[in-house]
């Protein structure tokens, strides 16, 4: 049986190196306002797409991958802002848990990040995370692990950084991972969210992001391909 693997990024810049690294002929399939790139790599069917920025877009794209293309695993590759001192530009981080940091139902006495009939933290796949660690060890790459906070805002202030660390013990922040992991969890599809650090989520974040986006995206993409090679 051919294994079907979904590979996601948020932006075109995040999937361009992925498409180039796999080096196969991809069929382009339009669906739901997006384009999915379908190809065969080492007897594995891979579906690659960028969702566009934000939780709504990434939810739509992940759901499409699962329901329309039948992917059995989802790997997310992209960039994020660091919230902690030991995560530097171009470092790699795999999410053990994710949280929607902009969810606030505290008016109803719910903790921040919590939605009724759900949970604050969204788990990722233990087996895929273990594979990521194995690949990192084999390649002598330092792979950090931690909580990633996702929200529909580009974080670029010290105050917000400090809040995300104190409230959620988050190591990095981005805009899609939690929604991708949530969809996968609900459909029972193993998910791994891999991020390379592009900025420090501070007042200089917009300039740092632009400067390091391409390099950080390539770092994440190369590591993701190594994971696919082992699946």
UniProtKB/Swiss-Prot annotation:
Gene that specifies this protein? mtnN
Instruction: Please name the pathway.
Output: Quinol/quinone metabolism; menaquinone biosynthesis; Amino-acid biosynthesis; L-methionine biosynthesis via salvage pathway; S-methyl-5-thio-alpha-D-ribose 1-phosphate from S-methyl-5'-thioadenosine (hydrolase route): step 1/2
UniProt keyword annotation of Methyltransferase present: no
Residue ranges crossing the lipid bilayer per the database entry: none
**What does the entry list under GO cellular component?**
cytosol
Q: What Gene Ontology terms for biological process does this UniProt record contain?
A: L-methionine salvage from methylthioadenosine; L-methionine salvage from S-adenosylmethionine; menaquinone biosynthetic process; nucleoside catabolic process
Q: Which InterPro entries match?
A: MTA_SAH_Nsdase, Nucleoside_phosphorylase_d, Nucleoside_phosphorylase_sf
User: Where do the annotations place substrate binding?
Assistant: 81, 155, 175-176
What EC number(s) would the UniProt record show? 3.2.2.30, 3.2.2.9
What keywords are assigned to this protein?
Answer: Amino-acid biosynthesis, Hydrolase, Menaquinone biosynthesis, Methionine biosynthesis
- Cleavable signal peptide: none
> CDD domains under this entry?
MTAN
> Function of this protein?
Catalyzes the direct conversion of aminodeoxyfutalosine (AFL) into dehypoxanthine futalosine (DHFL) and adenine via the hydrolysis of the N-glycosidic bond; this reaction seems to represent an essential step in the menaquinone biosynthesis pathway in Helicobacter species. Can also probably catalyzes the hydrolysis of 5'-methylthioadenosine (MTA) and S-adenosylhomocysteine (SAH) to adenine and the corresponding thioribose, 5'-methylthioribose and S-ribosylhomocysteine, respectively.
Q: How does it assemble?
A: Homodimer.
Please report which protein family the annotation says this sequence is part of: Belongs to the PNP/UDP phosphorylase family.
The positions flagged as active site in the entry are: 14, 199
Listed name of the protein:
Aminodeoxyfutalosine nucleosidase
Which reaction(s) does its UniProt entry say it catalyses? 6-amino-6-deoxyfutalosine + H2O = dehypoxanthine futalosine + adenine; S-adenosyl-L-homocysteine + H2O = S-(5-deoxy-D-ribos-5-yl)-L-homocysteine + adenine; S-methyl-5'-thioadenosine + H2O = 5-(methylsulfanyl)-D-ribose + adenine; 5'-deoxyadenosine + H2O = 5-deoxy-D-ribose + adenine
Alphabetized GO MF terms: 6-amino-6-deoxyfutalosine hydrolase activity; adenosylhomocysteine nucleosidase activity; methylthioadenosine nucleosidase activity
Write down the species.
Helicobacter pylori (strain ATCC 700392 / 26695)
């Amino acid at each position: 049986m051919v294994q079907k693997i979904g590979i996601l990024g948020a932006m075109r810049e995040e999937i361009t190196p992925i498409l180039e690294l796999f080096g196969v002929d991809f069929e382009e399939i339009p669906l739901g306002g997006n384009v999915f790139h379908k190809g065969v790599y080492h007897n594995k069917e891979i579906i690659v797409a960028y969702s566009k920025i934000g939780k709504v877009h990434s939810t739509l794209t992940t759901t499409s991958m699962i329901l329309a293309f039948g992917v059995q695993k989802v790997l997310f590759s992209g960039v994020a802002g660091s919230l902690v001192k030991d995560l530097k530009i171009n470092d790699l981080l795999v999410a053990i848990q994710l949280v929607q940091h902009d969810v606030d139902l505290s008016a109803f006495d719910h903790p921040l990040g919590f939605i009724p009939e759900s949970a604050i933290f969204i788990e990722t796949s233990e087996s895929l995370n273990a594979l990521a660690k194995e690949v990192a060890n084999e390649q002598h790459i330092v792979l950090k692990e931690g909580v990633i906070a996702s929200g529909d805002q580009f974080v670029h202030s010290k105050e917000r950084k400090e809040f995300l660390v104190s409230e959620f013990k988050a190591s990095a922040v981005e805009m899609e991972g939690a929604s991708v992991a949530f969809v996968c969890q609900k459909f029972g599809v193993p998910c791994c969210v891999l991020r390379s650090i592009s900025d420090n989520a501070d007042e200089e974040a917009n300039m740092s992001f632009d400067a390091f986006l391409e390099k950080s995206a390539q770092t994440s993409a190369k590591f993701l391909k190594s994971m696919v090679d082992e699946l």
